[in-house]
Amino acid sequence: MRNLIVCLVLLTGLVRTAFADEQKPAAKPLDVKSTFRNICGFCHENYGRKAAKGPQLMNSERSDEFMFNRIKNGMPGRMAAFGSAFTDDQIRDIVKFIRNLKPDQEPQNP
């Protein structure tokens, strides 16, 4: 009887653990403007409108796919990879933010 109770307690714990991942709340939307200022802004000044350690990003001729891959995978010796810091959807939002930059307007979150 004691073994049965121990097994039931362990089984209950395993079931609760298995379903715990499914009950996580949705990720909070990324504040792209603040993220860009605090992380990307070190190398891409004025929200990417001015070249610094990194290139100017506003009006870039690079494709969205190129920008996505560069943000996600980086470039050894030139840019850190941020694929482990952001989800793919968040990286897409960063690319949208860059695409919407205007020289004379305050940047907006996508």
Regions from the PLM with identified roles:
Residues 14-35, 108-109:
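Electrostatic cytochrome c docking/interface patches
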Residues 29-33, 42-78:
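Gly/Gly-Pro-rich "capping" loops immediately C-terminal to redox-active cysteine motifs
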Residues 35, 74, 85, 89:
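Residue-level signal for short amphipathic helical patches enriched in basic/charged
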Residues 38:
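Cys/His-enriched microdomains
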Residues 26, 61, 85-86:
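Short, conserved sequence motifs enriched in acidic/basic residues, glycine, and aromatics
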Residues 1-4:
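Positively charged n-region of N-terminal signal peptides that target proteins for export
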Residues 6-13:
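Bacterial N-terminal signal peptides
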Residues 84-110:
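C-terminal capping alpha-helices of c-type cytochrome domains
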